[in-house]
């Protein structure tokens, strides 16, 4: 029998803070290459066409956009709980 540790319960404030987390430093911590463009936009060569600015990202070619949590879930494939852990730290 395998015991799983319970998933943490995240408060509304923790989720709000994670949504607004600046993406560029988080992506740099994960060693993702970023290319700075005009007006504070960054491109990720590993994801052609994806644009990051502040705590938001958009990928026009795929009709996707979102906040920091969405990036970790939709683009990097993490679960919500793993995304929250990555964004909020240990």
Listing of model-derived features with the role each one plays in the protein:
Residues 1-90:
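N-terminal structured subdomain of primase-like DNA metabolism proteins
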């Amino acid at each position: 029998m395998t015991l799983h540790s319970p998933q943490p319960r995240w408060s509304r404030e923790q989720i709000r803070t994670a949504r607004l987390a600046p993406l560029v430093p988080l992506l740099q911590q994960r060693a993702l290459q970023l290319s700075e463009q005009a007006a504070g936009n960054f491109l990720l060569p590993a994801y052609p066409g994806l644009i990051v600015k502040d705590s938001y990202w958009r990928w026009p070619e795929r009709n996707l956009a979102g906040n920091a949590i969405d990036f970790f879930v939709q683009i990097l494939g993490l679960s919500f709980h793993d995304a929250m852990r990555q964004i909020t730290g240990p």
